[in-house]
């Protein structure tokens, strides 16, 4: 028999913290060929045909029917160049696992993909798929204590946009940063917490900017804080968009006629986890 004291129980209970989780729904035009191209990660499930409700945020023409899939994330969702690099790496690791055999080789492969896909040399590349996200996305959010959607402009320099719940992006980095009270007040932000029902939305401009952010010499491009997010993705010249959720990337086919929508809202009841820092 193992005996424990009341102090041990109190210590255990004091280390339990709440963690918000986020429900994501992707609504894409129902096109047979596009759906066949879609290879979803394990964290997402296919819902089939569903109804899309426009709250007045949509800018493009809406299709008659949409195909939906959904999932839940705890850490982050991202769209853009970082997800494209992650997708390329995951594809290579699946096809040729012997190449990704250790931390050093993984880092070299990642570096190769960032250069190949133009993250470091944007100005030298004319391919529209390698330009800023402002060309294809429209960002709408709901702020704290507000039920209305608000359009938020995405800076033209941003090539990856991230919605972050935990301060643990890309192997433990904190790209949002530890912001000073004066800056928080100026921007209308609050101190970021993992259980506050708020996502921090930031952008990464290009490889050099992302590299400095990852070593925490600078912060990412702060865009907004939100309790709900809607992204409208307009195809046009873009055939695909790259997304990832808690490290699982996928290639999202886009329609040339209709928009694809990503809706993110908080799961009503938070999860309970043990804070490892207290143990």
Where are these regions (language model features)?
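Catalytic core of DAGKc-family lipid kinases
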Residues: 1-169
């Amino acid at each position: 028999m193992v005996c424990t004291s009341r102090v041990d129980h109190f210590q255990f209970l004091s280390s339990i913290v709440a963690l918000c989780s986020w429900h994501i729904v992707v609504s894409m035009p129902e096109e047979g060929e596009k759906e066949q191209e879609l290879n979803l990660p394990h964290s997402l499930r296919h819902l089939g045909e569903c109804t899309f409700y426009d709250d007045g945020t949509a800018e493009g023409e809406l299709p008659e029917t949409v195909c939906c899939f959904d999932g839940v994330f705890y850490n982050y969702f991202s769209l853009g160049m970082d997800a494209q690099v992650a997708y390329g790496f995951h594809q290579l690791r699946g096809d040729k696992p012997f190449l990704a055999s250790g931390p050093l080789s993984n880092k070299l492969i990642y570096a190769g993909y960032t250069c190949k896909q133009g993250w470091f040399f944007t100005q030298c590349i004319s391919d529209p798929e390698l330009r800023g996200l402002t060309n294809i996305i429209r960002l709408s959010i709901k702020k704290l204590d507000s039920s209305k959607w608000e359009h938020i402009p995405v800076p033209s320099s941003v090539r990856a946009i991230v919605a972050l719940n935990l301060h643990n992006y890309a192997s433990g980095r904190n790209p949002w940063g530890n912001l000073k009270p004066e800056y928080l007040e100026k921007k209308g932000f609050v101190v970021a917490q993992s259980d506050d029902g708020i996502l921090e939305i930031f952008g990464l401009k290009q490889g050099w900017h992302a590299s400095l952010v990852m070593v925490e010499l600078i912060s990412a491009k702060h865009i907004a804080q939100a309790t709900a997010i809607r992204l409208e993705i307009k195809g046009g010249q873009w055939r695909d968009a790259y997304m990832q959720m808690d490290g699982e990337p996928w290639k999202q086919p886009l329609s040339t006629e209709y928009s694809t929508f990503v809706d993110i809202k908080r799961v009503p009841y938070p999860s309970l986890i043990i804070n490892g820092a207290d143990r």
